[in-house]
Amino acid sequence: MMRIAVDAMGGDHAPAEIVKGALRSIEQFDIEVILVGQPERIKEFLPQGEVPARVRIKEATEVVEMDEHPAQAVRRKKDSSIVVATRLVKEGEADALVSAGSTGAQMAASLLGLGRIKGIDRPAIVTVLPTLEGGKLLLDVGANPDAKPEHLVQYAMMGSIYAESILGIQNPKVGLLNIGTEETKGNELTQATYPLLQKAPLNFIGNVEGRAIPYGQAADVVVCEGFVGNVVLKTTEGLAGALFQLIKEKITATPLRKLGALAIKPGLKEIAKMMDYAEYGGAPLLGVHGISIISHGSSNEKAIFNAIRVAKECVESGFIEEIKKELPRFTAAQE
């Protein structure tokens, strides 16, 4: 049976929402969940304080706080929930890990505990962005604020394999995020990356502007360095929230508008669901030798449930082995 280690102490709403999401996951999936953290706090949110079937508690006495230096905290707090959860994956006691705690700490724990896939210089966080054409991938969204051209090529390769393995997109279109679609546009990084992507065994379609991302037609996988990707991700989240707040204010401003709002309410609910980050669960850290799913710090029960779902799908897909298999072909193309 598949086993998913869940950092029960990580996140703004831990351990309550984490435990709820884990319990919901065992109702839907044939998996075992290992809740990692402080047993007495975890049990407060279990039915009658009892540990149900297919749930196990692994004690971890320490917690990495959000304001701590990630790498230092991971090295110092050997018995923290994120370090212990990562160790379970490394030692084969769990098939994947999920955490809504410090992203930096999870990255550090994953790099130190799981290690990079041989041939991958830097890992990347990949996220699914909602678009008019369904979910599309953006990476890197924060693992590394800076990158070299060869790193972006590796991101493109991993993103392409992930899109095919997890999203079921055949021969995914890969685009390079830029300030214009022309080949000569951009800074030194994008201009140096463009010819490398042209040479790579990918379905590279060229540069993609930021405004094209929400429409989802230009590319299935959009590649950029982590600084830019994180700005795009958080701007998208903020814009979606602001738009829905504005719509709510305007359609309820008068009695007549309120009547009209009733007619469009089902459609608005569908849009809200499509834009809800909790529906997409978590963002995998690609390039490490194990499955490490990074969840939003404010994750609720639904987000944790979906993060566990993503972890399950990653285990089932075997995409890490696919990355290792495809890497030599990409490396040879760059020589």
UniProtKB/Swiss-Prot annotation:
Classification via SUPFAM superfamilies = Isocitrate/Isopropylmalate dehydrogenase-like
Taxonomic source organism: Desulfitobacterium hafniense (strain Y51)
Quote the protein name from its UniProt record. Phosphate acyltransferase
**Quaternary context:** Homodimer. Probably interacts with PlsY.
Protein task: Catalyzes the reversible formation of acyl-phosphate (acyl-PO(4)) from acyl-[acyl-carrier-protein] (acyl-ACP). This enzyme utilizes acyl-ACP as fatty acyl donor, but not acyl-CoA.
Q: In which pathway does it act?
A: Lipid metabolism; phospholipid metabolism
Q: Which domain of life is it from?
A: Bacteria
- Keyword Cytoplasm (UniProt): yes
Keywords of the record, alphabetical order, are:
Cytoplasm, Lipid biosynthesis, Lipid metabolism, Phospholipid biosynthesis, Phospholipid metabolism, Transferase
Coiled coil spans: none
Family as reported in the entry's similarity comment: Belongs to the PlsX family.
Q: What is its EC number?
A: 2.3.1.274
Tell me the lineage of the source organism: Bacteria, Bacillati, Bacillota, Clostridia, Eubacteriales
One example GO MF annotation: phosphate:acyl-[acyl carrier protein] acyltransferase activity
Catalysed conversion reaction: a fatty acyl-[ACP] + phosphate = an acyl phosphate + holo-[ACP]
Q: What class of enzyme is it?
A: transferase
Chief location category: cytoplasm
